[in-house]
Every structure is written in structure tokens, then in C-alpha cells.
């Protein structure tokens, strides 16, 4: 999963994992976990978790005086995480797939403008952009089939998608069906997630 992928990439780039702690989804008391982390004194904490557990670890870390940078994947990429974490998640960073304030292309900017025209607001989460990308990749694959209703052909063509100009950026899908795409890094500031950087594959 995400933890293993991070560990592999981090070590490859010279990083050292000083402590790995497994937690159970649904846990609420992380004081013992936080105490273990304090003892190791890491430079930062990577939490491949969803928002309920990540927000509680952040809050309990602050309560126990553990002030280290925290980073997660898109499992915390929602306003609920920020609301649950409160001041404890200020400065928390995480990855996401799209940021409407920094569209990566003209196509993306046009989509944001269309969304604002239709809904009355530009603000959107990444699932809106990903939904549009899914639809457009499917249509593109169907158009490359002699019979656009042939599911076998559609599946084959989806897995041949290369540098597709999506709302969220360029997308390539391999023969296993896994997508390679850019990611954005966001940081929590004053109760909102704000764009920080784009990371390209």
C-alpha cells in the first residue's frame, strides 16, 4: 500500500525510517503511539491514514507536546479532516489529485470556469475533476473501437491511454490498468487546504 511505496521511495532517496507503528482503523486513543514517536524524535511523521485517525493523532500530538511536521496521502484530502483536527492540523501537508486554484492546463481552467458557471462556485474537490477524467477517457477509448459497445475492446483501449489531456493533468494508463499522473501537495492554513506544489511522475 501507500506506506510501503513511501518507504521504498524514501529510502531510495537517502531517507531513514526511524520507527514504523501500525494502528487499527477505528482506534481513538493514540497517546501511547504519540509517546513512542516522541522518544524517536523523527524529523517528520508520515501518516498513510484516513481523516478520522489522522486528525486524532494530530490533536493528541499537540496535547502531548509533539510538534513535528505531518504528511499524509489523499485519505485526508477533505474539509472534514481539517474541521476535526482544528488548530492541530495547521501546517499539515497531504497529496491530492487536483487543485481548482491552480489548473494545470487550459482544458483544466476551462473546466473550472464551466463548473463555476453551472454551480455558481469555482470551488470543487478532486473527485469532480477525476469524474470528468474518467468519463472522457472512457469516451476516448470507445471512439478508438470499431464497435464502441464492445467491452473487451474498450478495456484494451483504456489500458493504451497515453498522455491523455485530462482535467487533472496528463494521464497514462498501463496494461495493468494503473494510472501514472501528476499529484499536487496541499497544506492546511487557517482552516483551509491551500495549494503548495505540483509533483510530476
Predicted regions and their residues:
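Extracytosolic ligand-binding ectodomains
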Residues: 1-201
Amino acid at each position: 500500500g501507500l506506506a510501503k511505496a513511501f518507504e521504498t521511495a524514501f529510502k531510495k532517496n537517502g531517507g531513514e525510517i526511524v520507527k514504523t507503528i501500525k494502528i487499527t482503523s477505528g482506534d481513538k486513543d493514540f497517546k501511547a503511539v504519540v509517546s513512542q514517536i516522541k522518544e524517536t524524535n523523527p524529523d517528520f511523521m508520515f501518516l498513510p491514514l484516513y481523516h478520522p485517525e489522522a486528525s486524532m493523532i494530530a490533536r493528541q500530538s499537540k496535547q502531548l507536546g509533539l510538534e513535528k511536521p505531518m504528511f499524509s496521502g489523499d485519505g485526508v484530502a477533505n474539509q472534514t479532516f481539517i474541521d476535526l483536527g482544528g488548530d492541530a492540523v495547521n501546517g499539515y501537508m497531504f497529496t491530492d489529485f487536483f487543485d481548482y486554484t491552480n489548473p494545470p492546463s487550459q482544458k483544466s481552467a476551462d473546466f473550472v470556469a464551466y463548473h463555476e458557471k453551472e454551480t455558481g462556485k469555482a470551488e470543487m474537490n478532486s473527485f469532480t475533476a477525476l469524474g470528468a477524467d474518467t468519463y472522457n477517457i472512457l469516451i476516448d477509448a470507445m471512439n478508438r473501437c470499431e464497435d464502441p459497445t464492445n467491452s473487451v475492446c474498450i478495456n484494451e483501449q483504456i489500458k493504451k491511454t497515453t498522455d491523455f489531456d485530462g482535467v487533472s493533468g496528463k494521464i497514462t494508463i498501463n496494461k495493468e490498468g494503473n494510472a501514472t499522473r501528476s499529484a499536487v501537495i496541499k497544506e492546511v492554513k487557517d482552516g483551509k487546504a491551500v495549494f503548495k506544489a505540483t509533483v510530476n511522475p
